[in-house]
C-alpha cells in the first residue's frame, strides 16, 4: 500500500461532500447534464411529444446522464493519480490529498456508472448504449491511452464529450435526424478550442507531467491555428439548424463571429496566456448561451 492509500484510509472520516464533488468533477457533470437536457428537450419539442406525460423519462435521462459523467470523472481521477501530483491545478484533488483512497474512488465510480447506465436503459436501449459508449471512450480510449500517448488526445476526447446531447435526444426519440447530429457536432467542435485554451495556460504543467498536449508538442502558434480551424467549423453548423428557426441561426452566427474575431486577434496578440484566458471565458459563455437559447427558442416554434 503506497503513502496515498495509507493516508486515504486514515482520513476516510473526513470524506466530505466537497471531496465527492471534486472527485466526480462536478463542473463537467453540470455542463454535460445541461447538454443532455437540451438534447432531450429538443426531442420533446420538435417531435410533438408531451413533456409532462414523460416525467419518468426526464428523471432517468437527467439523473442517468449525470451519474455516468460523474463515474467517468471519478475513473479519470483514479487513473491520473500518477500525474495529478505534478500539476498545480490537480495536486489538491481528494485522491491526491488522501481524503479519498484509490480503492474507494474506484468503488464510487463503479457504483455511479452501473446505476447511471441502468437508468439510461430504462428510457431506451439506444440511450443506454450511447451512455456505455461515452464512458468507454472517455475512460479507456482517452484517459488510459490517448491522453498520455497522442498529440491528438484533445480531439479524441471530444468524441465522448459530444455524447450527452445524443443521449438526451435518443432517450425520447430513438431515431436520427439533423438536429441530434448537429448537437453532437457543436459539442465536438467546441471542445478543442476550449481545452486548448487551458493547455496554453498550463503548458509547463502538462510538459512536466509528460502529457503530449498540442501546445507542448507543436507550440502555441500551431495551437492557435488549430483553435481557429475548429471555430471556423463551428461557424458553419448553424446553417444546418434552421429547424430551430431563424432567431437561433442569427444568434449562433453572431456568437461564432465574435469567437472567430477573438481567434484571429490571437495571432496579433503577444501575450498568449492572457489571450488563452479570454478564449476560455468566451468558450464557457458561448456554450451556456447557445444551449439555453436552443431550449428557450424551441418553446416558441
Swiss-Prot record:
Pfam families hit by this protein: UbiA
Keyword 4Fe-4S: no
GO terms for MF: protoheme IX farnesyltransferase activity
Keyword hit for Transmembrane: yes
Catalysed reactions, semicolon-separated: heme b + (2E,6E)-farnesyl diphosphate + H2O = Fe(II)-heme o + diphosphate
Gene Ontology cellular component terms for the protein in this record: plasma membrane
Topology term for the membrane: Multi-pass membrane protein
GO terms classed as biological process: heme O biosynthetic process
EC code: 2.5.1.141
UniProt keyword terms in alphabetical order: Cell membrane, Heme biosynthesis, Membrane, Transferase, Transmembrane, Transmembrane helix
Classification via InterPro entries: Protohaem_IX_farnesylTrfase, UbiA_prenyltransferase, UbiA_prenylTrfase_CS, UbiA_sf
Database matches in CDD domains: PT_UbiA_Cox10
Protein family (similarity comment): Belongs to the UbiA prenyltransferase family. Protoheme IX farnesyltransferase subfamily.
Record NCBIfam families: cyoE_ctaB
Function recorded in the entry: Converts heme B (protoheme IX) to heme O by substitution of the vinyl group on carbon 2 of heme B porphyrin ring with a hydroxyethyl farnesyl side group.
Name of this chain's protein: Protoheme IX farnesyltransferase
Amino acid at each position: 500500500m503506497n503513502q496515498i492509500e495509507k493516508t486515504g484510509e486514515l482520513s476516510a472520516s473526513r470524506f466530505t461532500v466537497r471531496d465527492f464533488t471534486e472527485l466526480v468533477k462536478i463542473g463537467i457533470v453540470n455542463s454535460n447534464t445541461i447538454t443532455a437536457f437540451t438534447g432531450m428537450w429538443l426531442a420533446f419539442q420538435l417531435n410533438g411529444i408531451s413533456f409532462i406525460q414523460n416525467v419518468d423519462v426526464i428523471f432517468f435521462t437527467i439523473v442517468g446522464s449525470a451519474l455516468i459523467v460523474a463515474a467517468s470523472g471519478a475513473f479519470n481521477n483514479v487513473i491520473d493519480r500518477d500525474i495529478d501530483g505534478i500539476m498545480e491545478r490537480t495536486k489538491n484533488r481528494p485522491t491526491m490529498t488522501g481524503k479519498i483512497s484509490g480503492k474507494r474512488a474506484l468503488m464510487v465510480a463503479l457504483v455511479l456508472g452501473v446505476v447511471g447506465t441502468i437508468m439510461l436503459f430504462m428510457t431506451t436501449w439506444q440511450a443506454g448504449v450511447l451512455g456505455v459508449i461515452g464512458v468507454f471512450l472517455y475512460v479507456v480510449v482517452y484517459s488510459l491511452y490517448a491522453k498520455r500517448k497522442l498529440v491528438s488526445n484533445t480531439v479524441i476526447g471530444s468524441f465522448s464529450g459530444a455524447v450527452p446531447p445524443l443521449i438526451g435526444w435518443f432517450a425520447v426519440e430513438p431515431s436520427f435526424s439533423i438536429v441530434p447530429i448537429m448537437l453532437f457536432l457543436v459539442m465536438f467542435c467546441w471542445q478543442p478550442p476550449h481545452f486548448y485554451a487551458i493547455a496554453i495556460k498550463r503548458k509547463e504543467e502538462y510538459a512536466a507531467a509528460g502529457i503530449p498536449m498540442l501546445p507542448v508538442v507543436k507550440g502555441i502558434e500551431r495551437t492557435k491555428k488549430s483553435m481557429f480551424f475548429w471555430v471556423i467549423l463551428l461557424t458553419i453548423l448553424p446553417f444546418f439548424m434552421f429547424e430551430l428557426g431563424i432567431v437561433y441561426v442569427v444568434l449562433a452566427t453572431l456568437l461564432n463571429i465574435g469567437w472567430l474575431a477573438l481567434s484571429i486577434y490571437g495571432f496579433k496578440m503577444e501575450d498568449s496566456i492572457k489571450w488563452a484566458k479570454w478564449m476560455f471565458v468566451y468558450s464557457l459563455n458561448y456554450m451556456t448561451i447557445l444551449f439555453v437559447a436552443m431550449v428557450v427558442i424551441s418553446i416558441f416554434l
